[in-house]
């Protein structure tokens, strides 16, 4: 039985941090270019995007743009909008797929027609608390096939990578053509998902304490996150009472279509962090160097990561990308899986666990039924061990639009699209 949804309100206009189900759902939709609309999807208005996000049970709280795309921090994760690509990533019990019909409707209104979709997620910690469309991967696949199956002859393809006996699995649905131009270079994305986070690191950086908090930008630097993305303009948040999100836009002109995003749920019992780097030219990606850097900052007890390469010759170049070696200091590889897509792409999936003896001493135990819920959290229980775990709170829907104050705090905003 699904637990009742927790009531969500803001205190002094501050949005409570996402929690419980850290694992994100992610959809990437590519569209055909429109010669009469060079801005493509970026012509979809802010009000229309707000409607799309409301359908998915989340909100836009900030936006940062460059010449290539717009990056939105959401109440639960992130949205990226390019002229011919949209990437939506949401955590908790958000209803990501419920936002797809509205997205396609407004894309059609600006003359954009979908040509490829890729949906990914890891295993849910509490799948029984997910909304109906995400109740199982079969349910998700049925929905995706109804909306995107026509993009591939014979329909799309679905895959589950990794062994259920060895931990988290990776779920993937893909349909359509990866490249509009045959000479287009393959692009890579790398998603790192971490649990059992280092307790000391979380308590020091990702809990908003009035006596020590300076700004979200300072948190990004002090926590080590800035060192991972030195060439990125970062839009960052420290939520109250805890939690962290950021979007990064590469500042270098040669690579300014690259984006990154990090989301952290630091609470005892369900600690989780994700770190993504996407839209990278294959020859520029050093997979294991990047993962080693991420692991050195967060020091998780467990982590999984997926490297996805999309392009007409993705399978040919994937060996070079993954040949650098899989050694990560302090960790042992539990499993590795590689899968070629039926439609121009390949994915590799890895699971690593801490092997240096520090996991039990310094990592957060992810326990069943929220038995170690933080007492100070607005959705904790006096007797958590005997309580049903509630849904991750849905976003607050009564704000017309949103922005953030100078210190990185989220607050409601009633400005125009241009101002927000």
Range-by-range predicted roles:
Residues 1-420:
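Polybasic/polar functional segments that serve as interface/processing modules
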């Amino acid at each position: 039985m699904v637990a009742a949804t927790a009531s969500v309100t803001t205190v002094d206009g501050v949005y409570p941090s996402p929690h419980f189900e850290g694992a994100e759902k992610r959809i990437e939709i590519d569209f055909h270019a429109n010669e009469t609309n060079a801005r493509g999807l970026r012509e979809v208005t802010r009000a229309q995007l707000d409607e799309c996000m409301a359908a998915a049970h989340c909100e836009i709280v900030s936006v940062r743009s460059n010449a290539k795309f717009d990056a939105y921090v959401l109440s639960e994760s992130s949205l990226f909008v390019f002229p011919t690509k949209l990437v939506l990533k949401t955590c908790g019990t958000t209803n990501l797929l419920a936002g797809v019909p509205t997205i396609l409707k407004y894309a059609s209104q600006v003359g954009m027609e979908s040509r490829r979709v890729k949906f990914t997620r890891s295993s849910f910690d509490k799948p029984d608390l997910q909304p109906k469309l995400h109740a199982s991967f079969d349910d998700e696949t049925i929905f995706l096939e109804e909306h995107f199956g026509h993009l591939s002859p014979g329909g799309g393809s679905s895959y589950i990578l990794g062994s259920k006996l060895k931990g988290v699995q990776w779920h993937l649905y893909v349909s359509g053509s990866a490249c509009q131009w045959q000479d287009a270079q393959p692009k890579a994305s790398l998603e790192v998902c971490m649990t059992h986070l280092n307790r000391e690191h979380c308590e020091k950086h990702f809990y908003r304490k009035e006596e020590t908090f300076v700004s979200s930008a300072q948190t990004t630097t002090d926590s080590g996150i800035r060192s991972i993305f030195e060439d990125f303009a970062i839009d960052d948040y420290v939520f109250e009472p805890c939690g962290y999100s950021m979007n990064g836009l590469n500042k270098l002109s040669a690579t300014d279509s690259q984006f990154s995003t990090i989301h952290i749920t630091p609470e005892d019992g369900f600690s989780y962090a994700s770190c993504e780097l996407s839209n990278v030219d294959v020859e520029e990606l050093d997979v294991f160097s990047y993962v080693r850097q991420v692991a050195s900052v967060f020091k998780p007890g467990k982590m999984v990561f997926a490297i996805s390469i999309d392009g007409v010759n993705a399978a040919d170049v994937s060996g070079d990308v993954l040949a650098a070696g899989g050694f990560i200091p302090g960790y042992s590889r539990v499993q590795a899986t590689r899968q070629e897509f039926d439609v121009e792409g390949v994915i590799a999936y890895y699971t690593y666990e801490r092997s240096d003896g520090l996991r039990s001493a310094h990592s957060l135990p992810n326990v069943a039924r929220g038995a170690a819920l933080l007492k100070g959290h607005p959705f904790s229980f006096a007797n958590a061990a005997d309580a049903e775990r509630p849904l991750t709170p849905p976003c607050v829907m009564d704000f017309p639009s949103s922005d953030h104050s100078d210190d990185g705090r989220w607050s409601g905003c009633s400005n125009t699209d241009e101002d927000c």
